[in-house]
Each structure stands twice: as structure tokens, then as C-alpha cells.
């Protein structure tokens, strides 16, 4: 009888595969580029571990299916810290690649980063199994930060909370089948109204997942990590690949706990006494009486020592009193007791060290990054000297970690490579030149970091204000450095780096952004197209190329690039919205609305399609619908540009014109590319007879959207009013190129030409 259900399941599986249903679960997929086969990331790999709406992907890469004879291939496994968040192009793998290439010329070192944001060891194990098939010479493993918050973690905001490994692997095996994927999709649909995230919300998604030091789910997560790590190392052993396994360093000194909870079972009297002592300690610490504060905190610890904030405050006091060894221990305990566990703790690093020891005879080599970064830190306690925030390394930190890896790798390289040893490792400064770390890039990297630390869970840290000041100082320091390098010097750095690495996608991508920021549109487009050639599987490359083409007025070509992005990723909201904008400006209303609504379905929290839909509705006189769209956008961006744009339109409905202008000025200051706001501001300024200012806003609107006909019409009118007929004619003729049937433009041209004829 068992054969009947097996036959049914087998038939269903075959039918689904023949119908093309489901997705490939492998980490890599094969593509062909100019007659050569390459492997690139499979964008749907993480669907087994995340709801598709919040699935994570790795950084762009491609490597030859047939490894060249002079190549040394390294796979770097881990999470966002290994990847190099917030800017992977300056991650540890990139620095390592430069170090090896500079010291051992003639060898093509491939450091392939297969690290992915927000994953954990449950995801890294199948990645490792796929890497085992692709001729790796060495694996680097730098993982552990997400064991509590990643898929199947103890604090995850989606899925099961730290089930056993057998259950996890059974579920993942089921999802490898198309039948399992169908069942998973049906279950998600039935739970569509549940608390499962619809879009990725970063670290703030895990705010409600607090667990204690000895919580059973936490202990299961540790056991799972140990089992997964052992299996990863055994996978490498079977593939005959040596492994450099590293402990993980974290910010101890400048990152307070994200959440603190008391030891379960304390009585009301104990909690009351603890709070009284703790608050008195804070009063003394704030006043600079660190010895008195320290004594009070230690007294509180006699009642409950597991409150993470208490341990961190002990660390601050010991640090102030130069008790550096004890301060380090205090900060480590604060990290270990953190109830929102985004950092590798003592137990995770102990598991890593123990695994390296157990597998030492199977070519597993330990790098103790946690100790190395501590030893190179002031007072022996790592902080913002090496980190952007809690775990992500800055330029200096990534270089130091890469140098530590390189030293270990040096002893593992074959004689065919070490025979060309140049004798020294490249300096951080030289690595920076090879990676084109311009002052413009340094400032650019700090901006998303600063935005991150102004959001949950960082806002929940008790010392958030002080931490924010430190980060703000770092950002200002980066901005101040902008004066130390001219744009031409930065450009030369890019060009020199590209001359040595002409196929480096990251260099081309950053050079593209740099050229765009400098107003070199044609060259920026060339770089964007080169990026598409290097990583043809990446939809973002086509999208960015399309946005540049729009600004150059090459609308048909831009639409083609947006279409190619959508062909790769059917739910690419940004590209769908961009298609809607093009069609809207071509007055293809129904098609434009279709694309805007499709973008909203793909990402309900994406502001732009609501604004663009509202602007289209407003132009059609559908005021109520437009206001509803603007209000939705405003709700997604409170106190942001969308909010002020909504306020401007609400004020316009009440004829409060000064308020309209003030709000629109605020919008364009905060978001210069918000072309609809610029256009509306131009209209208001023209109505107030501020013609020159209006002309500026219409010109800026056209710079961002050269296909927006009303801006050309209004700019032409403003120019004609100022007695500039030739320039006005140029704008009206542009309108006719965009819309040959435009009667307003024809009438304006006739009027100006008649005037010029009578008044030559």
C-alpha cells in the first residue's frame, strides 16, 4: 500500500517540474556569456529559508565553470560581517584578494564571497555543500552573528524558533521538491494575514524576540550551530579542501546591549531593591563618581547579575578607572547577556575554537579574530576603532582581519605560488588605492550606517544618544576628508584601479556612481552598461543603467533596460515603477497605472509608486484619488519628503500658497531628485511672478525627467516671459519631438515666430 502514495507524490512532483513550477534550490546557477560558461548566484536560493518577500541574496559574482590553471579559488562563507556590510566592495574578502595578488603576482586569486545577510549556519551548510562541487582551493569561514535571529534561530521573526536539527533538515529537504514548494506556498497564502513580514525591515524586525541567557531555545540554537559547523567542516574534508575557520569579533566597548531582562524568578522585593541600587548607581556614574557607582552596581549584581545593561555600566566604570582587564570581562558579559542577540557571544566563539581543535587533523586552521582585534585595540577592548556599529567592520577592521587571514593562508599555498613571493604584505593605503577607496566613497559608506543607527534596535540602547554622537562624529570626519582629494584625483584613482582589474564589477559600479554625481552622464552610462556585461544576471545593473538613460533623454533605450531588469526579477518594484513613469509621461495612462499598481504589489512599503500614481491621478483631475495616494506615501515616510509633499498638496487645496511653497522647498532640499515637487514648486513660483526661480525649478525638473512635457512647456513660457525667444523656441520644439500633436507648443511657436518676424 505504501507504493500508492509514493506513486501519487512522484507523479505530482514530475507534473510540477514539467509545468515549470517552483525554483531551483542550489546556491549557484550556470550561465553562458560570450561563449564561456560561468556560475553566478541563484537569486531564489534563500526561498527555502525566508518568505520570498524578504528573501536575501549575496553580492554579485561570477566565476568560470572551468577553473584556469593559474587560479587559486577561495570561497568566503558567512553572513553580513563576512560580506562586508554596508559596502561589500570594501569587505574582508576584497582586501584579502588585493593582499594575495600584490604579494604573489602571476596567480589569479579568486576570493568568491558566498556570504549572505541575515543567514545563519542552517543556511551556510547547504551553501558549503554546493561550494564543494566547484574546485575550491580553500574555504574561509567567518560566521556566527545570526545564530539567534537567522532562519530557525531562537529569536527569529519568521518561522520556527530553534527546532532540532533533524526537524530543520527534514523541512528543508521537503522544500527541495516542487511538491514541497507548492505546499509551502499554499501555507503562506493561508497565513497571509499573519505577522509574517511582507518586506525586509532590517534588525528592527526582531525587536520582540527577547530571550534570556539560559532560555531553552537559545541552548538549542547553540547545539544546532555546533552540529552545522561540524557538518560544514566534514563537507570540506570530503572535498579535500582546507579550511581557515575564524572566531568572530564584535564591538564590545561602544555597543551597549540592545535589550536587558532580569533573571526569571526574582521576587517583587528583590526587583525593588535591585532597581533602587541600580538607579543610585546611575546617578553616581552620571556625576562622574565611578568608584561609588561601581560599588553600587556590584551590589546590584549580587541580586541579579544577568541584566545586560548592568554589566555594560560596570564596564564603563571599570574603563574610566583604568581597570582594563576587568572592563573587558564586563563588556563581554554585557554582550553575552544581551536579550536581543545580534552578536557572536562567548559560547559561539568557544564552539568555533573547539571545532577547530577537533578537526585540526583534517586541515582546519584557526584564526582567532576576536583576540587579534582586541589585542590591536586601545585598552584591549574593540569598539568603533574597527566597527561601524555592532558587528560590521570598517575599512581598518576589514584590512586587519584580511591581513590575519592572509598570514594563515601564506603557509597553505603551494610552492608554485610562493615561489613568486614579494616578501611583504601590501599596506592598508595601497589596498585602498587598488580598491579605489576615494574620500567620496568613505563618506558615501558612512551615510547608510548613520541611517541604521538612528533606527531600532539601536534607538533602544540606553546610551543611544552618546553612541549617535560618536557615529555622527565619524560621519563628519568622513565629510571633512572630502577636501583632501580633488574630483580629478579621485577619478585617477578609479582609472588606475581599473587598469589593473578591468573586469572588477565593483570598481565599475562605484566609478559609475562617481561619474554620475559629477555630472558626467555619458561616461556613467558606459560604466553602467559595462556592469551589465560583467554581471548580466543582476537586475539592479539594468535598472541603474535605465535611470541614467532616462536623464539623458534616451527613453526607449531606458525602457528596454527596465524591461530586462523585470525579465530577470518579475517583482522588481523599482523597475516596475520606472516603467510606469515612462508610460505616464507618454500619456499612456492605463498602462502606467498597471505598472504603478504592480510595483505596489511587489513592495507595499515602497514610497515612489504611490507618489507617481498620485501625480498621474492629479494630472487627470482625480483629486480625491491623488490625495489618497499621497497620504499613503506620507504614512510610509513620516516627516520625510513624501510627507511634506502631501502637506503641500493639502495646503494647496486650502489655498495656503505660502505654506505650499515652504513645504515644496523643504522637499526639494531633502530630496533634490523629487522632480514632481520641483515642477509643482515651479508652478507656484511662476504664479507668484518669481519667474527666474520658476525657470530654475523647471530646468531642474527637466534634468531629472527630460521626457516630462509640462516642464518643457512651462520652461518655454518662463523663457519667453523673460525675453529669451530662442531658448523658449528650443523648449517648445522639444515638446513637439516628444508629442508631435501638442497644440500648445505649436501655438507658442507660431506666436514667437510671428513676433520675431515683425520685430526682427
PLM features: residue spans?
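Helix-start (N-cap) detector for alpha-helical repeat units in TPR-like alpha-solenoids
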Residues: 274, 308-309, 505-506, 539-540, ...
Amino acid at each position: 500500500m505504501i507504493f500508492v502514495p509514493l506513486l501519487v507524490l512522484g507523479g505530482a512532483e514530475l507534473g510540477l517540474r514539467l509545468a515549470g513550477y517552483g525554483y531551483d534550490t542550489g546556491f549557484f546557477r550556470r550561465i553562458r556569456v560570450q561563449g564561456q560558461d560561468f556560475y553566478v548566484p541563484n537569486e531564489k536560493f534563500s526561498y527555502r529559508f525566508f518568505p520570498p518577500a524578504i528573501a536575501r541574496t549575496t553580492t554579485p559574482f561570477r566565476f568560470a565553470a572551468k577553473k584556469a590553471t593559474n587560479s587559486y579559488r577561495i570561497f568566503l562563507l558567512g553572513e553580513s560581517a563576512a560580506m562586508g556590510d554596508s559596502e561589500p566592495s570594501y569587505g574582508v574578502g576584497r582586501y584579502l584578494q588585493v593582499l594575495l595578488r600584490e604579494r604573489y603576482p602571476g596567480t589569479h586569486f579568486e576570493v568568491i564571497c558566498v556570504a549572505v545577510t541575515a543567514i545563519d549556519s542552517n543556511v551556510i551548510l547547504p551553501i558549503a555543500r554546493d561550494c564543494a562541487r566547484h574546485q575550491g582551493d580553500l574555504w574561509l569561514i567567518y560566521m556566527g552573528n545570526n545564530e539567534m535571529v537567522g532562519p530557525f534561530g531562537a529569536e527569529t521573526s519568521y518561522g520556527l524558533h530553534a527546532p532540532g536539527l533533524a526537524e530543520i533538515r527534514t523541512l528543508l529537504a521537503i522544500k527541495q521538491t516542487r511538491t514541497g514548494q507548492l505546499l509551502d506556498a499554499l501555507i503562506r497564502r493561508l497565513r497571509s494575514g499573519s505577522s509574517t513580514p511582507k518586506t525586509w525591515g532590517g534588525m528592527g524586525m526582531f525587536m520582540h524576540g527577547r530571550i534570556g541567557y539560559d532560555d531553552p531555545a537559545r541552548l538549542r540554537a547553540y547545539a544546532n550551530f555546533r552540529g552545522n559547523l561540524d557538518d560544514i567542516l566534514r563537507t570540506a574534508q570530503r572535498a579535500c579542501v582546507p579550511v581557515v575557520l575564524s572566531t568572530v569579533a564584535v564591538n564590545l566597548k561602544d555597543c551597549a546591549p540592545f535589550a536587558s531582562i532580569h533573571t526569571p524568578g526574582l521576587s517583587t522585593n528583590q526587583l525593588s531593591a535591585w532597581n533602587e541600587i541600580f538607579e543610585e548607581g546611575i546617578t553616581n556614574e552620571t556625576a562622574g563618581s565611578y568608584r561609588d557607582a561601581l560599588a553600587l552596581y556590584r551590589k546590584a549584581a549580587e541580586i541579579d547579575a544577568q541584566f545586560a545593561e548592568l554589566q555594560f555600566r560596570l564596564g564603563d566604570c571599570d574603563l574610566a578607572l583604568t581597570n582594563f582587564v576587568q572592563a573587558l570581562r564586563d563588556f563581554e558579559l554585557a554582550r553575552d547577556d544581551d536579550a536581543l542577540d545580534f552578536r557572536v557571544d562567548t559560547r559561539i566563539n568557544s564552539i568555533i575554537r573547539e571545532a577547530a581543535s577537533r578537526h585540526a587533523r583534517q586541515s582546519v586552521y584557526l584564526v582567532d579574530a576576536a583576540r587579534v582585534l582586541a589585542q590591536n585595540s586601545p585598552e584591549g577592548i574593540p569598539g568603533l576603532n574597527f566597527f561601524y556599529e555592532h558587528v560590521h567592520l570598517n575599512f581598518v577592521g576589514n584590512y586587519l582581519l584580511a591581513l590575519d587571514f592572509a598570514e594563515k593562508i601564506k603557509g597553505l599555498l603551494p610552492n608554485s605560488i610562493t615561489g613568486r613571493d614579494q616578501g611583504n604584505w601590501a599596506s592598508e593605503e595601497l589596498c585602498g588605492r587598488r580598491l579605489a577607496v576615494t574620500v567620496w566613497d568613505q563618506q558615501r559608506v558612512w551615510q547608510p550606517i548613520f541611517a541604521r543607527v538612528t533606527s531600532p534596535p539601536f534607538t533602544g540602547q540606553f546610551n543611544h544618544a552618546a553612541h549617535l554622537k560618536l557615529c555622527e562624529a565619524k560621519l563628519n570626519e568622513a565629510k571633512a576628508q572630502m577636501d583632501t582629494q580633488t574630483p580629478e584625483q579621485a577619478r585617477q584613482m578609479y582609472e588606475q584601479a581599473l587598469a589593473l582589474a578591468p573586469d572588477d564589477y565593483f570598481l565599475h559600479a562605484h566609478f559609475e556612481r562617481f561619474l554620475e554625481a559629477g555630472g558626467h552622464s555619458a561616461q556613467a552610462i558606459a560604466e553602467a552598461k559595462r556592469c551589465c556585461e560583467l554581471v548580466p544576471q543582476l537586475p539592479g545593473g539594468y535598472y541603474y543603467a535605465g535611470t541614467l538613460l532616462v536623464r539623458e533623454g534616451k527613453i526607449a533605450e531606458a525602457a528596454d533596460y527596465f524591461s530586462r531588469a523585470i525579465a530577470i526579477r518579475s517583482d522588481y518594484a523599482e523597475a516596475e515603477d520606472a516603467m510606469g513613469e515612462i508610460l505616464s509621461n507618454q500619456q499612456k495612462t492605463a498602462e502606467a497605472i498597471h505598472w504603478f499598481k504592480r510595483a505596489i504589489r511587489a513592495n507595499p512599503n515602497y514610497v515612489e509608486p504611490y507618489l507617481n500614481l498620485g501625480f498621474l491621478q492629479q494630472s487627470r483631475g482625480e483629486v480625491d484619488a491623488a490625495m489618497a495616494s499621497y497620504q499613503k506615501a506620507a504614512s510610509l515616510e513620516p516627516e520625510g519628503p513624501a510627507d511634506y509633499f502631501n502637506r503641500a498638496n493639502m495646503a494647496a487645496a486650502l489655498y495656503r500658497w505660502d505654506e505650499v511653497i515652504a513645504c515644496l522647498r523643504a522637499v526639494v532640499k531633502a530630496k533634490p531628485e523629487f522632480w514632481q515637487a520641483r515642477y509643482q514648486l515651479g508652478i507656484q513660483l511662476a504664479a507668484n511672478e518669481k519667474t527666474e526661480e520658476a525657470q530654475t525649478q523647471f530646468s531642474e525638473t527637466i534634468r531629472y525627467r527630460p521626457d516630462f512635457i509640462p516642464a518643457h512647456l512651462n520652461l518655454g513660457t518662463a523663457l519667453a516671459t523673460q525675453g529669451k525667444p530662442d531658448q523658449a523656441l528650443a523648449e517648445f520644439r522639444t515638446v513637439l519631438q516628444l508629442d508631435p500633436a501638442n497644440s500648445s507648443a505649436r501655438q507658442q511657436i507660431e506666436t514667437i515666430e510671428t513676433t520675431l518676424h515683425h520685430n526682427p
